[in-house]
A protein has these predicted regions:
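Alpha/beta enzyme core
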Residues: 2-128, 132-144, 172, 177-181
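Flexible C-terminal active-site loop/helix
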Residues: 145-181
Length: 181
C-alpha cells in the first residue's frame, strides 16, 4: 500500500498560457494544504511530506520560510526541489529538525551519502534518468524487432534471475498458491 505522499505548494493546475512558468501558492495557502492533508490522514503511519519548489522558483529565503512553516503545521518531512549547493542544503538543514527529501540533482559534491545523512536527508531523488533509460531500452528493443532482429539475438535483455528478483517471483508464486489453487 501507500506509505507516504507529498503535498506540494505549486499552483496546480497551471493557468492557461503559463507553461514553463511554475508559480507557487502563498505560504498561508501552502500551510492550508498541508493542514488539510494532515487532518484527513486516517493511518498514523502514513508519512506526509510538504513539498516545495521554492529553491528553484523563488529563492532560498522563501524556501526556508516555507520549510519552517510546513514543519510547524506538522508535516513529517520536507521535500525540496531545486536545492543545488551544499550551502543551500545547510541553510535548510540548520533551520528544521524533520527529515529532508531532495528532488532533482544537486552539485556532484553534494551527492556524498554520508554528507546527506549528516544533513538529515533521508531520500535524494536524482532526476528521471532511470525512466529515460527504460524508455530508450524499450524503444531500441521494439525498433530492433521491427527491423527483423530475432528475439534470441536482442541485446541488453535481463537474465531470468534478474527478472525473478525484480518481479518478486516468490511473492507471486505464494499468492498464486494461496488464491488460485
Amino acid at each position: 500500500g501507500v506509505s507516504g505522499m507529498s503535498i506540494e505548494d505549486t499552483e496546480l493546475p497551471q493557468p492557461f498560457g503559463s507553461v514553463g512558468r511554475t508559480k507557487l501558492l502563498s505560504i498561508p495557502e501552502g500551510v492550508g494544504k498541508m493542514k488539510a492533508a494532515l487532518d484527513a490522514r486516517q493511518d498514523p503511519n502514513l508519512i506526509i511530506a510538504g513539498r516545495t519548489s521554492a529553491p528553484g522558483v523563488t529563492n532560498m529565503e522563501d524556501a526556508l520560510e516555507r520549510a519552517m512553516a510546513y514543519e510547524k503545521v506538522g508535516v513529517d518531512a520536507i521535500f525540496l526541489v531545486g536545492v543545488k549547493t551544499k550551502e543551500q542544503l545547510e541553510k535548510i538543514s540548520d533551520a528544521i529538525s524533520i527529515p529532508i527529501i531532495l528532488g532533482g540533482g544537486g552539485s556532484s559534491d553534494m551527492m556524498d551519502l554520508d554528507y546527506l545523512s549528516e544533513k538529515n536527508v533521508r531520500i535524494c531523488l536524482q532526476g528521471h534518468q532511470p525512466f529515460s533509460a527504460a524508455v530508450k531500452a524499450i524503444y531500441d528493443t521494439m525498433k530492433a524487432l521491427r527491423e527483423g532482429t530475432p528475439p534470441e539475438e536482442l541485446q541488453g535483455i535481463a537474465s531470468a534471475e534478474l527478472m525473478k528478483k525484480v518481479t518478486n517471483i516468490t511473492d507471486y508464486e505464494n499468492m498464486f498458491d494461496k488464491y488460485l489453487k
